[in-house]
């Protein structure tokens, strides 16, 4: 099976490739080979090529979903429409969505993800896997779970800017969902990549604080509870490692 991953240098794309390259023929072109903002680049890349699955992770604005820069909306839609222009070159498309579709729909990033998901529903064999938060040892050092595991390892206070309910999924479990969609048929058009049980940032910090035989203080920058960032789980009949085991795995790899 031949799979194209767009946005090949990104965190999710690299994680998919590292996990599945032995099972599938995975193509992860750099921007010099496939620039989704340039139709000439797309024409050249797709010439005489066909893929069983395209996993669309390429996106602008993901590092700051509140960014008001309207070019984020423009370029995200340009990339997706350019990809659509080559739909005869692939059988299935898996779009990596975002919780920002639901919780930040008035931002250029959230609005673009919302429009893309609506377009997904217009095509057979197009699907959205909506990610709220994803983590493992390879995520950016500033991300909530990894940053606080590192603080715990260094015996430093953990930091919670503002407590909230938030859905995180361990990267290996996200890969399991992606592979389910790679191989599956008669699939839901969109699913939230979340666990059945909701978790607060405070609860996640408490899990980290129980990783060894000592505890560290937890510092709150704001003691009020913020808006939740969660989705309804789907029943995909997948056995997950789960949030707690994912945190344990990250700790064991970082310590």
Locations of the language-model features?
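NAD(P)-dependent short-chain dehydrogenase/reductase
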Residues: 106-110, 114, 118-166, 171-176, ...
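SDR active-site strand-loop-helix element
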Residues: 6, 29, 54-58, 93-99, ...
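NAD(P)H-binding glycine-rich loop region in Rossmannoid oxidoreductase-like domains
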Residues: 40-75, 100
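NAD(P)-cofactor binding segment of oxidoreductase domains
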Residues: 66-93, 114, 118-119
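Adenosine-cofactor binding site in Rossmann-like domains, unifying the SAM/SAH pocket
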Residues: 25-44
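C-terminal substrate-binding subdomain of Rossmann-fold SDR/epimerase-dehydratase oxidoreductases
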Residues: 156, 160-255
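N-terminal Rossmann NAD(P)H-binding glycine-rich loop of SDR-like oxidoreductase domains
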Residues: 2-22
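Conserved Rossmann-fold NAD(P)-dependent oxidoreductase catalytic core, especially the SDR/UDP-sugar
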Residues: 60, 81-110, 127
